[in-house]
Amino acid sequence: MSKIKDAFTKGKAFIPFISAGDHGIENTERYIRVMVKAGADMVEIGIPFSDPTAEGPVIQEASTRALSTGVKIHDIFDMVHRLRTGDDAVTVPLVFMTYLNPIYVFGREKFFTLCEEVGISGVIVPDMPFEEKGELGSIANKHGVEVVSLIAPTSENRIEMIAKEAEGFIYCVSSLGVTGMRSEIKTDIKSIVETIRKYTDIPVAVGFGISTPDQAEAMARVSDGAIVGSAIVK
């Protein structure tokens, strides 16, 4: 069983998001430890980027604040290394949320080599088309890193295509558009998850727009877990 899938074996998974470097990398490390002690089953760590096209204003502003501190990708890898070592080592899966540009600029092989060395279990790359997953995925898999697929409201044919190739877990996008808190989630998540489960037994976690405990509970009822980002970052 993959490290990521293992996070879903204890029940419904709670997956918080944090933007690395926002308010300083030392605080990011501290917040992640607090999240894990509070019961997070996996933590999604956002690598700040100047053009985060999938993000709403809250996470965009967090990225801008992080970049203004001068945080670099190497600093984030060093932080993850600290989290993974010592008597108080964090053992839950840690996944990066990033974009193609930072990976390519840093160097794909170098990026995934360091992911393997420090203990990153997976990456989420929202601006990578499914059709282009192959090359990046092969490099990631060589280093034991899973590339998480996103599924938004779309045709069953496309859901089938993505679900059959998924690894780790599937990130089910609750609302079209960018991330951010929504007062109401109108998408029929239950039917999307049921469609996904026709083609794979990979866990499905719902994200984008979850802003209240009630919403998180509702999404977890029809899936395997809930991802909460903007509400935590705010």
Q: Which residues does each predicted region cover?
A:
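N-terminal amphipathic alpha-helix/helix-capping segment at the start of soluble metabolic enzymes
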Residues: 1-15, 79-85
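Catalytic cores of alpha/beta
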Residues: 25-36, 154-164, 206, 210-226
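Catalytic beta/alpha-barrel core
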Residues: 68-70, 119-132, 146-154, 160, ...
